[in-house]
Amino acid sequence: MAPRIPSIPSSTDLSGQSALVTGSNTGIGFENARQFLQLKASPVYLAVRSVERGQEAKKLLLDDPEVKKKNPGAVVEIYQVDMASFDSVAAFAQKFSEVKKLNIAVLNAGVSFFKYIPTSDGYETVLQVNYLSNALLATHLLPLLKAGAAASGKPSHLAFVSSNMQHMTSLKKNTIKPNENIIDWFNNRANFGMDRYNVSKLLLTGFTNELASKIDSSQVVINSMCPGLVATNFDTNSPWYLKYLMKGVRSLMARTPSEGARALTLAAITGTEGNGKYYSDGKETPSAALLLTEDGKAFQKKLWDQTLERIQQLDPTSPPPI
């Protein structure tokens, strides 16, 4: 059995705070939104690919007995975004900016594929959805989060859903040559591997580390976390033999979506001591060993610089994060 994720402190009260959760019409994103509502957050924004499914999720959330009891005036709003399209992310960001301020953002949307599938933007899907689009969206959300902090007098929170799979990649010290662009290297079909999901979470954690080191934690607390193995349909795109294997593993070890979502909620309510941290099982833990070495830190810095440059190329309206 997986270690138990700590309970959310009973004193937690998110009254007057707004929260955004991406990928929130199902699974741990849905349960994370439910937990925010039960903690009295409002409005809670669901950023989803399908508005119809988002509306179904909204009804389920507002019909939840505990939400009705603890947060009877709760507001849930639906926004459409497809993380496999940079234009969609930019359009969502522009529309969402109308809220003016935000207190909590949990970037949960992600995918897993075991074959190279390009998006309409010409990027490998897992690289784009799990990494580049999350980085792009984060730059758009930071001004809103800073405004939320200024209005509330306490730090806002930006939490990225990562994974312990970042510890298991084929990436080594000299895998990518100094003169090679990291994003282009991973976007090259010849460099695609079965560990692409793992790599995407390594990149996301590296970006999170750099971002957290550059933003004042009294304004925005930034961190990442792993919810662990959760009983969801996340492996829909896996080969049949992996689905069969994971079905057995999940029956023995998987957390419920509600339990997994607690990891997201806990990361999103930490104090400033949680800035730049990586959490697993609801507890602070080291990120991938590669990122902790001097070479890894240099890789992380290079990734940061090249990601910001690429984001500006993809979406010139993206505000500089620092």
Swiss-Prot record:
Signal peptide: none annotated. Gene3D superfamilies: NAD(P)-binding Rossmann-like Domain. The keyword Lyase does not apply. Pathway: Secondary metabolite biosynthesis; terpenoid biosynthesis. GO terms for molecular function: oxidoreductase activity. Induction: Expression is down-regulated by the cluster-specific transcription factor AOL_s00215g275. Expression is also down-regulated by the HOG1-MAPK pathway downstream transcription factor MSN2. This is Short chain dehydrogenase AOL_s00215g274. It is an enzyme of class 1 (oxidoreductase). Keywords: NAD, NADP, Oxidoreductase. Disruption phenotype: Abolishes the production of arthrobotrisins A to D and arthrosporol A, and leads to the accumulation of 11 new sesquiterpenyl epoxy-cyclohexenoids (SECs) and derivatives with diverse oxidation patterns. Shows substantial reduction in conidiation. Develops far more adhesive trapping devices and traps and increases the number of captured nematodes by the traps. Shows significantly increased ammonia levels in fungal mycelia. Short chain dehydrogenase; part of the gene cluster that mediates the biosynthesis of sesquiterpenyl epoxy-cyclohexenoids (SECs) such as anthrobotrisins and arthrosporols, metabolites that possess a novel hybrid carbon skeleton consisting of a polyketide-derived epoxycyclohexenol combined with a terpenoid-derived monocyclic sesquiterpenol substructure (PKS-PTS hybrid). The SEC pathway plays an important role for fungal soil colonization via decreasing fungal nematode-capturing ability. It comes from Arthrobotrys oligospora (strain ATCC 24927 / CBS 115.81 / DSM 1491). The active site is at residue 197. NAD(+) binds at residues 47-48, 104-106, 197-201, 230-232. It comes from the Eukaryota. The keyword NAD applies. Belongs to the short-chain dehydrogenases/reductases (SDR) family.
